[in-house]
Amino acid sequence: MASDLLFLPGEACFAAALPMLIKTTFPDYSVATYAWIGPALGALARWAGGWIADKLGGARVTILSFIGMAASIIGVITFLPSGGDGGNFPGFLACFLAAFVASGIGNGSTFRQIPVIFRNQHLKGLTEGTPEYARALKQTETESGAVTGFTAGIAAYGFFFIPALFANFAVTSAMWGFVGFYVTCIAITWWFYARKGAESPS
């Protein structure tokens, strides 16, 4: 699932990036004062993401979360110091917090998407109450549970991914890489899960 990849440059990634960027690009501001806000907002947004996905559909909400993250990171880039400009910390922080919220919403919608995708794949054309339906339902639960666990596990790599990325690339270049990644995920999610006639609508 493309939406599984949300968790690589997503909430955990942002949780690693925000304190690093405050420390290196806005050293006059305290990391301890601001770094906790983003993860807290992201955690609250997860519930909202699941609820909204129930109303609008998981794929649609996941795409909107990718759009929100891309727009937020472009805002972060805009407010970073560049050249002789010292940057704008309030704008930087607001955009970064918006990225956390968008990622949290995508987190919630992705976990709503996963079982729907497997149900659509395995139960299509089967009659409820038949042995075939029962076997397919059990297979659906097994596979969706495994993918859910795998998806959650990906998040842990964010804490390794960010320091390695910033050690090898300029901050602005890395951020533009995030934007490109989100655009790619939008296209993949739309093609496989959201468009009319999609392979696995969710």
Regions inferred by a protein language model and the residue ranges of each:
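Multi-pass alpha-helical transporter architecture, strongest
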Residues: 177-202
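A late C-terminal transmembrane helix in Major Facilitator Superfamily
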Residues: 125-170
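Residue-level signature of mid-helix packing/kink "hotspots" within the transmembrane helices
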Residues: 39-47, 156, 160
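Extracytoplasmic gate region of multi-pass secondary transporters
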Residues: 1-43, 107, 111-112
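A membrane-interface helix-boundary motif in multi-pass transporters
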Residues: 164-182
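Intracellular juxtamembrane helix-capping segments at the cytosolic ends
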Residues: 105-135
